[in-house]
Amino acid sequence: MNSFSFFLVIFVVLNLQVAKLMAFPASEDLSQDPRDMDQITNTVFDLRALQSALQKSQVNTKSRSKRLENDDDDDFDCDCDEEYDDEYIEEYCDCD
């Protein structure tokens, strides 16, 4: 097989591959379907809600751990500038 025949075969095979790809366009094109963008937006809102819930959980865990550490300490004076849950503030803080 001479070099011209070899390059001709490669050219035909590549054209067939391109033709196959053109026959089946990508179904994952987000710019074509606005419902996909709505789904992405909803996912972002869900992630923000999860982040907010996680932050609240961390604050509550922090206040519970401080409460457990200082459960026997009657003279404990909490820092009123810290973020504690309402139950903790009522029980342990004098922030009036």
Swiss-Prot record:
Known tissue expression: Expressed by the venom gland.
Cellular component GO terms held in the UniProt record: extracellular region
Residues making up the signal peptide according to the UniProt record: 1-23
Compartments, as annotated in UniProt: Secreted
Keyword RNA-binding: no
Superkingdom, natural source: Eukaryota
PTM info: Contains 2 disulfide bonds.
Membrane-crossing segments per the record: none
Predominant location category: secreted
Any GO MF annotation of the entry: toxin activity
Alphabetically ordered keywords of this record: Disulfide bond, Secreted, Signal, Toxin
Family, per entry: Belongs to the scoloptoxin-06 family.
Protein name listed in UniProt: U-scoloptoxin(06)-Sm1a
Organism: Scolopendra morsitans
